Amino acid sequence: MLKLTERINTIPGKFTLQESLKSSPISQVFLCTLNNTKAVVRFDLPSASLLAIDRRNEWILLKSIQDLRIAPRTLYQDTLQGLMIWEFIEGDQFLLNSANQESSLQSLGSTLSMIHGTSTPKESKDIFSESLHLYKNLLEDSSHKSLLQKTLSLYDELTADGINYVLSHNDLNKGNILWNQRCYFLDWEYAGLNHPGFDIASLVRTYRLNKNEFHELLSGYSMDNNRFNFDQITQWVVFSELLDEVWEKSVSLLAKNTFNKAN
């Protein structure tokens, strides 16, 4: 993978790199402009290629939901150089307050319903399942084996209810949800088929929703709400917390292995 400046030089058109927005163990994200359009660019770090995420798959999914206007419009991608550019969305972090809580939760549920009601493109990959398989291969012989087993066992238990998998975001947290007259979801790298309870639980966990607030969320979701009850979703919250730990351990191990190979 080329150095950052060399990767920038591969971008066609008039490109200007601006301030850093965020950094993670797998990527760096910056504000930028592309042909005078305000945009965001993400540069993958070496460890990104070792995860089960697939940038072409992310591009395909974003294109498939473009008309819903709930995600950024993609502008440019180069999988070889590990970069993607999408249009910047003006907005504020989605927050709940007493003045608008009911309508905000319903809007949040409605946006999630649009995703879950969208058909998954035939050529897309099952990123979530592939990620779980990768974590298993990485951790099953490590000191984190018990954490891994607890996480996977709970997932098997929760998904044994017969509910069909749907197109899911799989990474809904405060940093990935914006508000500007409507909800927008960002960072679709883990998107793909999954049990709908996972996304719902992610929102319950992120905003610490109580039982009444959970039902307000479901009133906006309105996709056979009888399938979900608060106790079930609470168990999904536990799973999401465990999965975050598994992800952190896995990424840390991959980063360590990458560093050791480089030295």
Language-model features, listed with the residues they occupy:
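An alpha-helical support segment within catalytic cores of ATP-dependent transferases
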Residues: 1-12, 118-170, 180, 219, ...
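Conserved N-terminal boundary motif of the eukaryotic protein kinase catalytic domain
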Residues: 12-20
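ATP-binding pocket architecture of kinase catalytic cores
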Residues: 22-123
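Active-site acidic catalytic loop and adjacent metal/ATP-binding pocket
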Residues: 25-33, 38-41, 155-198
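Conserved protein kinase catalytic core
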Residues: 48, 93, 177, 193-195, ...
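ATP/Mg2+ or Mg2+-diphosphate-binding catalytic cores
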Residues: 145-146, 246-263
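Active-site activation/catalytic loop segments of kinase-like enzymes and analogous catalytic loops
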Residues: 197-225, 238-254
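Start-of-helix signal in alpha-solenoid helical-repeat scaffolds, especially tetratricopeptide repeats
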Residues: 231, 235-239
